[in-house]
Amino acid sequence: MLSAAEGILLSIATVEAGLGVLGNTFIALVNCMDWAKNNKLSMTGFLLIGLATSRIFIVWLLTLDAYAKLFYPSKYFSSSLIEIISYIWMTVNHLTVWFATSLSIFYFLKIANFSDCVFLWLKRRTDKAFVFLLGCLLTSWVISFSFVVKVMKDGKVNHRNRTSEMYWEKRQFTINYVFLNIGVISLFMMTLTACFLLIMSLWRHSRQMQSGVSGFRDLNTEAHVKAIKFLISFIILFVLYFIGVSIEIICIFIPENKLLFIFGFTTASIYPCCHSFILILSNSQLKQAFVKVLQGLKFF
């Protein structure tokens, strides 16, 4: 049985997960409908569909993992469920970060202004940048997958008092965890770099605008600010997600602390929930469709 605090926190996390599924499903449906209508899929549409779909899987995996650990711990650790979830989660997690990073790079190349020859070459050949990112994804996935296999083989299952708990030597587990996420961290660092360069581009553009009309904000400035807000929100929410997942994994060593585990689940669920609605509000097409849905609901 859960305590009152644990029950309340789990309810909050479940609501976050539900909103995350609804928000990301909406994003995927709107872009798929636009694809079917125009018989053409833009790069932004492709990235949004991929990001939304992968996040739906992430939410379901987080929820399934949390409920299985809380209510069926013996079956969870004694069966192959933990291995299945680990392999699927590792793959989907890489895809989610890759789509988010690719979207960040796309906004950066589209909006930023630099005279550097490498930047200008990438700006004209965006597809080359995505081929490079795809290579990074495949490389990091192969490395991470091999470490997941290693961790699962090294895991020792101990049956005591009808409870199955997986024990790993903590130092080795920490090393494995770092290597498991090295690809994700590398992609995340690309987003940080894109955000920093966008801020630099905005600063340079603002200095150039100082010679113009005072207080005038042109469309380029607005685009910079909008993209920077999007990137910063992703960075903050992804850090929360990473912290939440780390807390959940650490709780393997302290399975009796259910409150801490549920807190990790709640923290991790903030990212797919909140960022989906940030995407909806920051994208004009998604925002218009969302307003139409809200207006339609008023008639019921």
Curated annotation (Swiss-Prot):
GO terms for cellular component: membrane. The chain crosses the membrane at residues 8-28, 44-64, 88-108, 129-149, 182-202, 234-254, 260-280. Glycans are attached at residue 161. Its main location: membrane. The keyword Methyltransferase does not apply. Gene3D superfamilies: Rhodopsin 7-helix transmembrane proteins (1.20.1070.10). One of its GO terms (molecular function) is taste receptor activity. Pfam families: TAS2R. It is a multi-pass membrane protein. Expressed in subsets of taste receptor cells of the tongue and palate epithelium and exclusively in gustducin-positive cells. Expressed in gastric and duodenal tissues. InterPro entries: TAS2R. Residues 1-7, 65-87, 150-181, 255-259 are extracellular. Disruption phenotype: Mice fail to avoid cycloheximide at low concentrations and show a lack of cycloheximide-induced action potentials in a principal nerve innervating taste receptor cells of the tongue. Keywords: G-protein coupled receptor, Glycoprotein, Membrane, Receptor, Sensory transduction, Taste, Transducer, Transmembrane, Transmembrane helix. GO terms for biological process: sensory perception of bitter taste. It comes from the Eukaryota. It is found in: Membrane. The keyword Transferase does not apply. Gustducin-coupled cycloheximide receptor implicated in the perception of bitter compounds in the oral cavity and the gastrointestinal tract. Signals through PLCB2 and the calcium-regulated cation channel TRPM5. Belongs to the G-protein coupled receptor T2R family. PANTHER family: TASTE RECEPTOR TYPE 2 (PTHR11394), TASTE RECEPTOR TYPE 2 MEMBER 105 (PTHR11394:SF132). Several bitter taste receptors are expressed in a single taste receptor cell. This is Taste receptor type 2 member 105.
